[in-house]
Amino acid sequence: MGNSDSLKAVWFRRDFRLHDHTALKHAIEAIEKHGGKWLAFFYLDPKTASVEPVHHDYFFQTVMQFKQMLKTNGGDLYIITGTIEGALSKLLQAFPEIDAVYANDDRVGDGRLRDEAAEHFLAKQSIPFYTFEDAYLTEPDQVLKKDGTPYKVFTPYYKAWAKERKRTPAVIKRDVLLGSVHKGTAPDREAETLFNNLIKKCSYDWSAIGEEHAIKRLQMFTKKRLSGYKANRDFPSITGTSRLSPYIKTGAVSSRSIYYHILNAEADSYSAETFLKELAWRDFYRMVHFYEPDCKDREIMEGYRELNWSHDQDDLTSWKRGETGFPIVDAGMRQLLNEGWMHNRLRMITASFLTKDLLIDWRLGERYFERMLIDYDPSSNIGGWQWAASVGTDAVPYFRIFNPVTQSKRFDENGTYIRTYIPELNHVPDHYIHEPWKMSEEEQVKYKCRLDEDYPLPIVDHSKQRKKALSFFKGDDEE
């Protein structure tokens, strides 16, 4: 017999949507069978609230947009904070009718520890805590080698991943969803105030956020850009990528919805496969993170754990500010500063420059990207940095060192991208745009760009640094 007074509490984390939401689907199905209502809540970790990276601006604005959307539909997103035990206790005190908590799981990093603590606390209250795999297309321990061990190389992983049947999007009955949403009094006024203050302190303002915009962008990309994705995705001056990553980060759209939307699209099959392979890379790096839980702080390749990386603050600051004297590197870093996002080709170029040209510790780069990227995904970011630094799983060989000038000429031939983010070089002609240091003094005056005044000279000599990097990784550097 059903209990019409019971409440199902759905814990939203990085899944701010009402469609294709696995935990929400199960909560609604329970309500259909047994009656009751559901409420939504968000746990604001005090550690998260105490720092103000750019990606938090985007994330918290998404949370606020979702909260407002729920209010429009008769509900609310309740904010709780404090220790996880204390926060959940407040929630249960405010809503004693709660008889189950539902969430999409977090199986890596701090989220894993938080969920273990939450499960332990709720068990003491005799309240079941149901968690579901949702954020990825495959579970981290699903695609393994025949001997049950994780893959170390992406290509064979991808072949196995491609054969795996992917979960289809979760269908949620909209009438039941909106008809059973609960509206009550906020359980934690302190948390609501803390959250509102975080919103007020946001230094960046994003308008195209949330579920509705995510779906529109997916549809637009599929219709207008997918067919040219394979050919255009590496050129930053072309709008050739999906720009879906911030929406994936916040869960405004699910990877399942994207996967099946692309799979069923009438587009070039090679471009579609190339795009889907990026989703496989996301699953791959999450799998690596699952089996290498210390990879944020430690190289996966044991042979490189004792490298004597540089921590030169002047070089690091030049890199962060986009003042290295290498236009393609600086354009990428300035895009990151201005937009909280960077084209993927530039992520590789800038990471290679930091670790191979400056020989600066990859962890410093990873931490900076963590602070700045609005699409920051721990597993993918760590994996990408260890790849660039040649110290991770299936990493680029240490002797493959990106030449920033060659990369610039190949992927931004006419300097369109460079000029977008480095106005000092607007008048510099194409034949100097990649190497402005080759201009004579007369040409610098003519093109309104005086080196070391308007735009910096290169902070390193790439050819010399390449030789130094090779020695560094071989272990025969003298420093």
From Swiss-Prot:
- Tell whether Flavoprotein is among the UniProt keywords: yes
Which catalytic reaction applies to this protein? cyclobutadipyrimidine (in DNA) = 2 pyrimidine residues (in DNA)
One of its Pfam families is FAD_binding_7
What start and end residues bound the annotated signal peptide? none
| An example Gene Ontology molecular-function term | DNA binding
Listed cofactors: FAD; (6R)-5,10-methylene-5,6,7,8-tetrahydrofolate
Using the record's annotation, list all stretches that form the Photolyase/cryptochrome alpha/beta domain.
6-137
Provide the site residues for: Electron transfer via tryptophanyl radical. Answer: W309, W362, W385
An annotated GO BP: response to light stimulus
Q: Which InterPro entries match?
A: Crypto/Photolyase_FAD-like_sf, Crypto/Photolyase_N_sf, Cryptochr/Photolyase_FAD-bd, Cryptochrome/DNA_photolyase_1, DNA_photolyase_1_CS_C, DNA_photolyase_N, Rossmann-like_a/b/a_fold
Between which residues do disulfide bridges form?
none
- Residues annotated as binding DNA are R233, Q407
How, per the record, is the cofactor bound?
Binds 1 FAD per subunit. Binds 1 5,10-methenyltetrahydrofolate (MTHF) non-covalently per subunit.
- Could you tell me the EC number(s) of this protein? 4.1.99.3
| Keywords for this protein | Chromophore, DNA damage, DNA repair, DNA-binding, FAD, Flavoprotein, Lyase
Q: Where is this region: Interaction with DNA?
A: 278-285, 344-345
Coiled-coil positions = none
Residues involved in FAD binding: 229, 241-245, 278-285, 375-377
How the protein assembles, per its UniProt entry? Monomer.
Family under the similarity heading: Belongs to the DNA photolyase class-1 family.
Record's function text: Involved in repair of UV radiation-induced DNA damage. Catalyzes the light-dependent monomerization (300-600 nm) of cyclobutyl pyrimidine dimers (in cis-syn configuration), which are formed between adjacent bases on the same DNA strand upon exposure to ultraviolet radiation.
PANTHER family on file? CRYPTOCHROME, CRYPTOCHROME CIRCADIAN CLOCK 5 ISOFORM X1
What's the protein called, per UniProt? Deoxyribodipyrimidine photo-lyase
Source species of the chain: Alkalihalophilus pseudofirmus (strain ATCC BAA-2126 / JCM 17055 / OF4) (Bacillus pseudofirmus)
